[in-house]
């Protein structure tokens, strides 16, 4: 009886190994989140938007006076 149970457990372990073969994680380290836009591109965008807003304010002050 013990031998049958041992064989059954070995068969289950073997079949589990076969069904999970190839499902190995690429890395064990947690994946860090990547931004879709780089920091330099974001800084350029903020510079252009803020610069044009400041330029527009200065131009409207000159025209108003």
Curated annotation (Swiss-Prot):
InterPro entries: ER_stress-assoc
Places the protein is found: Membrane; Endoplasmic reticulum membrane
GO biological-process terms attached to the record: endoplasmic reticulum unfolded protein response
Membrane-spanning ranges: 38-58
Entry GO CC: endoplasmic reticulum; endoplasmic reticulum membrane
UniProt entry keywords in alphabetical sequence: Endoplasmic reticulum, Membrane, Transmembrane, Transmembrane helix, Unfolded protein response
Predominant localisation class: membrane
Signal peptide residue numbers: none
One Pfam family in the UniProt entry: RAMP4
Chain coiled-coil ranges: none
Membrane topology label: Single-pass membrane protein
Entry similarity comment: Belongs to the RAMP4 family.
Subunit structure: Interacts with SEC61B, SEC61A1 and the SEC61 complex. Interacts with CANX.
Function: Interacts with target proteins during their translocation into the lumen of the endoplasmic reticulum. Protects unfolded target proteins against degradation during ER stress. May facilitate glycosylation of target proteins after termination of ER stress. May modulate the use of N-glycosylation sites on target proteins.
Record's protein name: Stress-associated endoplasmic reticulum protein 2
Source organism per UniProt: Bos taurus (Bovine)
